[in-house]
Structure formats: structure tokens, C-alpha cells
Amino acid sequence: MSPPSPGRRREQRRPRAAATMATPLPGRAGGPATPLSPTRLSRLQEKEELRELNDRLAHYIDRVRALELENDRLLLKISEKEEVTTREVSGIKALYESELADARRVLDETARERARLQIEIGKLRAELDEVNKSAKKREGELTVAQGRVKDLESLFHRSEVELAAALSDKRGLESDVAELRAQLAKAEDGHAVAKKQLEKETLMRVDLENRCQSLQEELDFRKSVFEEEVRETRRRHERRLVEVDSSRQQEYDFKMAQALEELRSQHDEQVRLYKLELEQTYQAKLDSAKLSSDQNDKAASAAREELKEARMRLESLSYQLSGLQKQASAAEDRIRELEEAMAGERDKFRKMLDAKEQEMTEMRDVMQQQLAEYQELLDVKLALDMEINAYRKLLEGEEERLKLSPSPSSRVTVSRATSSSSGSLSATGRLGRSKRKRLEVEEPLGSGPSVLGTGTGGSGGFHLAQQASASGSVSIEEIDLEGKFVQLKNNSDKDQSLGNWRIKRQVLEGEEIAYKFTPKYILRAGQMVTVWAAGAGVAHSPPSTLVWKGQSSWGTGESFRTVLVNADGEEVAMRTVKKSSVMRENENGEEEEEEAEFGEEDLFHQQGDPRTTSRGCYVM
């Protein structure tokens, strides 16, 4: 006979206690008889009822003992039958274990392949980020070069404008120089004419001086002739005077002298008048020639000064023009070099972008292929799970039929139930959708090591349920079970404004916390945003990564509820997580309640989600 179970021992202890409680109290011996009160009557009735219950309990204990004896006999027969059926079940069990080992091997290979693909995807994403950073850096350098080219173009345009202004000034100065040269030519012509007139006047003066000298000589000659004639006349007079009377000689000498004096005075007056007129004419012509010559000299000197200044200005403008031309040529060469460099960089960037796009296309194709293979493996896994469940049911049926004890192997049951209802999509793009997703995880503990701990004489586990719903285009895609982040996703093909929207979190019946988006925040179509708590140590990088600086954790517990509320206070998305504990028996036969501990596992990710990583196979 097998020893009684702890449950039976407790049942046996309870009747003894009840019997002890039901023992009647002794009355007072030899006391006088008194009329019974209602309280006394009720106590007597209760004693009678307790006595009957004790009798029934004793009968029940006898019955239980008889049943235990019968049970021991049946257990002996079962043990005999087990020896017989063990040989029959060994073949099925070996086949089941081989298929189970194959399924485990396939799942392990799938997990390893998936981990390898995740590592490759991470490397490719890191390379893509580096390429994007390099492209952004090159784009910044290209923008700086384009700005430099624009500055040089503006400088070149200013140089062209200054060159055009200098050329116009040069043309104006050239016209001024031409006019000055024409005036100078006219002045030189006038100067030549004045010189010619001066030469003529000089010749005339010389001619007049010669004529004056000839007239003076002629006058001297005539004077000498006249004096000779006077002397001759005097000699004749003297000869006549010899004959004339001496009285008349004095009168005649006086008249002679008077006539000679008058003739001399008239001749002197004529010579003086002629000389004065000649001098006045010569002086007037000489003054006129000098004045004209002075004017011509002044005009020529002024023209020479203006010509000199024009030449100096022309030389200065020529120097400036040559400098501007050199600057313009240097700017053109620099612009040409920058354009060539920019064209080379543009071609290089275009080739790099084409190569990266080709690589990204190949990566997408590889990822799609790997996702397809992963989906096929998941389908195979689901099929294997179904077959394993079928084998398990068959084994359980055989065990029940043959009355065998179930094997203490760990098992995990994962059930998914999703239901979605989508409304009509109108021409304006309005999307009405509500979905609910429920995920349950149940993991009983066996005799071997498991996630929760180890045990040899009992079984236990935990139950984790997660529900999600969304009535709009934005859903709560993922939440961290350790309270590090909450992730939202825009499932539509249009941008969604999240201005003044709030994410609320309530753990058990505690205080509700809320994160509020900025008034201008917009979630792009098909994009996700992750709101991290400050204690996660993640850097703030909008618009995809936001940090809640005023909260160190989103909070966690046995159950918590996360809600997305729009600006009008309406709930548009919700996700709840509930964690329940299970009961297990220890070696002493006592039931203990154990709370399940869980971390951030990827049991809640959808099929094909690339965020999941290989954490080990918990299915088998």
C-alpha cells in the first residue's frame, strides 16, 4: 500500500478538530433541575447536530479508509498493467521522441539562421547609416561649394558690372580725349596761323624798319644834298652879295635862314609823323600778335594739361581694367575648376547613390527572400506544433486509456486570437478601423530546469496576456515590459498630426501618468515613433526617437494599461498587459503561489517581425 497523500492527511486532521469542537461540555453534577431557556435549548440542539455530524464524519472516515484500501489494490493492479503497457507504448514513445528531436533541431536551426540574418541586417543597416551620414556630409560640402560658387558668381557679376562701368568711363574719356585732341589741333592750327601772322608782322616790321632806314638814309642824303645845294646857293649868294648891296645882304640872310628853318621844321614834322604812325602800326600789330600768341599758348598749355590728365586717368583706368580682367579671369578659372570639381563630385555621389540604391535593392530582395523563407519556416513550425499537439493528444488519450501517469515534461502553449473589422475606405481617404489582438503564454514547470526555476516534485508556470485595439490609423505597436519605452505606428498612407495627443499609462490601480506630444508633431505615413523613458539612457533624436525627460520609467507590474488619447480626449488606441501567477506543489505536498518573472521577450511580436531575436527555444 502506498502512503496516504498530504491531502488525505489534512482531511484526517480536520475531522479530529471537528470532533474535538463537537465534544459536549459536562453539566453541573447534582444540580437542581431548572426550566430550559431558549438559549439552552438551541445549545442542546447544536450539540445534537454536532453529535450527528461526528457520527457522519466517523462513517465518512471509515468509508475513506475502505476506499484507500481499494485504491491501493487498484494501484497495485495499475502498476502491473503499466509493466504490460510500457512495452506497448515504448515504440510510439520512441517515434514521438525522435520526431520531437527533429522538430527541436529544425527550430534550433531556424533560430540560429534567424539570429544570423538579424546580425547581417544589423550590419547592413549600420553600413547604410554610415553611407547616409557620408552622403549627408558630401551634400553639406556640395552645398558649401555651391554657396562658394554663388559668391564667386556674384563677385564675377559685380566685376563685370564694374568692368562695364570702367569701359563706359573709358569710352567717355576717349571721347573727351578725342574732343581735347580736336581742340588741341584747332589750337595748334591757330597757333600756327598766329606764328605765320607773327612772322608776317616780323617781316613787315623788318621791311618797315628797312624802309624807315632807307627813308632815313634818303632823308640824310636829301639833307646832305639840300645842304650842298644850300652851300652852293650860299656860294652863289655870296658871289651875288658881292654884287648886291651890303644893306640887302642881312635881309636876304635872314629870309634865307627863315626859309631854311621852316623847310627843316616841316621836314622834321613829316618825318616825326611818319615815324610815329609807323611805330603805332607796328606796335599795334605786335601787341595783337603777342596777345594772340599768349592766348594760343594758354589754350595749348590747357589742352596739354587736360591731355596729360586724360592720359593719367586713361592709364589708371587701364590698370584698373587690367586688374579687373585678371580678377575676372581668375574668378572664371576658379568657377570652371569648381564646376568641374562639383560635376566630378556630383557624378561620384550619383554613382555612389546608384551603387547604394542597388545594394539597398539587393538587401531588400534578400530580406524579402529571407522573410519568405522565415515565413515558410514559421509555417513548418506551426505544422510541427500542430503535429506535436496531435501526438500529445494521442499520447494523453493512450495514457488515459491505459491509466498511465503523464510524463513530467515542460510544455508551452501559445495561443493567438486576432479579430479585426475594417470599415469602408472612402474617396477622401478616411480610414475607420478597429482591431483587437490577444496573446497568451502559458508555461507549466516540470522536473527539469525552466525559465522560472527548477523543481523535482511539482509543476507550475505563469500566464501572460496582452490585448491591443485601435480605432484609427495610429496604433500602439509595442510596449516594453520593463517600462523603458512605448512605440506608436502610423498604419495609413497619410501623415497624422499628433499635436497635443497623450500617451497614458496606469499600473494596477495606481496613479495614471501621461506623456504629451508637442503641438506641431507629425507622424509620417508608415513610420513609427518610440517614446523612451529618461531612465533608459537613450539620446533624444526626433522625430523617430523621443525621450520623456520628466519620467524615469513608464512603470510595470502584474497588469498595466496603455492608452493613446487624441487632442479631443478620445481614446484611439489601447494595449493592456496582464500577468498572472500559477500554483505549484512542493516536495512536502503544500501548495505555493509563485509569481512569474518575465523580461523583455519577443513573444508578443507578430510573425515576420525583424525586431525579434533568438533567445532560445521554449516551445519544446
From Swiss-Prot:
B-type lamins undergo a series of modifications, such as farnesylation and phosphorylation. Increased phosphorylation of the lamins occurs before envelope disintegration and probably plays a role in regulating lamin associations. Phosphorylation plays a key role in lamin organization, subcellular localization and nuclear envelope disintegration. Phosphorylation by CDK1 at Ser-37 and Ser-407 at the onset of mitosis drives lamin disassembly and nuclear envelope breakdown. Transmembrane segments: none annotated. The modification N6-acetyllysine is found at residue 81. A lipid is attached at residue 617 (S-farnesyl cysteine). The modification Phosphothreonine is found at residues 23, 34. Residues 46-402 form the IF rod domain. Residues 588-601 have a biased composition (Acidic residues). Its main location: nucleus. The gene is LMNB2. Lamins are intermediate filament proteins that assemble into a filamentous meshwork, and which constitute the major components of the nuclear lamina, a fibrous layer on the nucleoplasmic side of the inner nuclear membrane. Lamins provide a framework for the nuclear envelope, bridging the nuclear envelope and chromatin, thereby playing an important role in nuclear assembly, chromatin organization, nuclear membrane and telomere dynamics. Residues 1-48 are annotated as: Head. GO terms for biological process: heterochromatin formation; nuclear envelope organization; nuclear migration; nuclear pore localization; protein localization to nuclear envelope. This is Lamin-B2. Residues 462-579 form the LTD domain. Residues 401-620 are annotated as: Tail. Residues 618-620 form a propeptide. Residues 96-229 are annotated as: Coil 1B. It is found in: Nucleus lamina. Residues 84-95 are annotated as: Linker 1. Belongs to the intermediate filament family.
